[in-house]
Design a protein with these regions (language model features):
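Glycine-rich beta-to-alpha transition loops that act as phosphate-gripper elements at the mouths
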Residues: 21-23, 70-78, 94-98, 114-119, ...
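Glycine/Thr-rich beta-alpha phosphate-binding loop at enzyme active sites
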Residues: 45-46, 85-87, 108, 118, ...
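Hydrophobic, well-structured mid-protein blocks that either form specific transmembrane helices
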Residues: 80-125
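Catalytic cores of alpha/beta
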Residues: 31, 77-87, 120-128, 145, ...
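Conserved beta-strand positions in the central sheet of alpha/beta enzyme cores
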Residues: 44, 71, 93, 113, ...
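CoA-thioester-processing core
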Residues: 112, 143-153, 158
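Glycine-rich phosphate-binding active-site loops on the catalytic face of alpha/beta enzymes
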Residues: 95-101, 135-143, 175-198
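Conserved N-terminal beta1-alpha1 strand-loop-helix module at the mouth
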Residues: 1-87, 107, 155, 166, ...
Length: 218
């Protein structure tokens, strides 16, 4: 298992985290395969998928080269976080800030990414030891939220999730996001069984993020 710094560095490098929601383990595996084929090397397997811990174990066994980062999402409490970590999850994402979940992650040396939406929540999560602040829901917050938070809290590390698509992902990166979580906009092809569409969308996300960073470096 990679250490916390390595995991966070890889997530920042790829810039996009695939938020995988599915009705079965089989469908989730197909979505994961399609995302990885598109260059999306950070996968968030959510606990809305039935038997998510078994899915995490299976994907960790399948992609064991160290190049793919498998995490758990929609983790609602510390007990679920521990189950996910023991199954092999390399990072934990939650829709809200729960101190006990963050403490559990720190106990195991696993990055935690709790959801936040206000400066108060951001500071509380940071003081508890959260590694990345999940800006959620991103479609309400908009990229300006990150700039506004970075004004008084410049050391906040943030990743939006919800509402991120290929048309606005560059705006999020340029606003200061370490990476972006993409769900329905990335995996919508799964509804019709068009997994090639997921792969192509993944490639486009990766390309747009590279473009944004290149433009920022000028």
């Amino acid at each position: 298992m990679a250490n916390k710094i390595e995991t966070l560095s890889k997530i920042q490098e790829v810039g996009i985290v695939a938020v995988v929601r599915a009705t079965s383990i089989e469908q989730a595996e197909k979505i994961t395969d399609a995302c990885i084929a598109g260059g999306v090397a950070a996968i968030e397997l959510t606990y809305t998928v039935p038997h998510a811990d078994k899915l995490i174990e299976a994907m960790k066994a399948k992609y064991n080269s160290g190049e793919i980062i498998i995490g758990a999402g929609t983790v609602m409490d510390a007990a679920t976080a521990r189950i996910a970590i023991l199954a092999g999850a390399e990072y934990i994402v939650s829709p809200y800030f729960d101190p006990e979940t963050v403490k559990c992650c720190n106990r195991y040396g696993i990055p935690s990414m709790p959801g936040i939406y206000t400066p108060t929540e951001a500071v509380a999560a940071m003081e508890c030891g959260a590694d990345v602040l999940k800006v959620f829901p991103g479609d309400i917050a908009t990229p300006s939220f990150i700039k506004d938070i970075h004004g008084p809290i410049p050391n906040a590390v943030m990743m939006p999730s919800g509402g991120v698509d290929v048309d606005n992902v560059k705006d999020w990166i340029k606003a200061g996001a370490i990476a972006c979580g993409a769900g329905s906009s990335l995996i919508k092809g799964a509804k019709t069984g068009d997994y090639d569409q997921i792969t192509e969308t993944g490639k486009l996300f990766v390309q747009r993020i590279k473009e944004a960073r290149a433009e920022m470096a000028k």
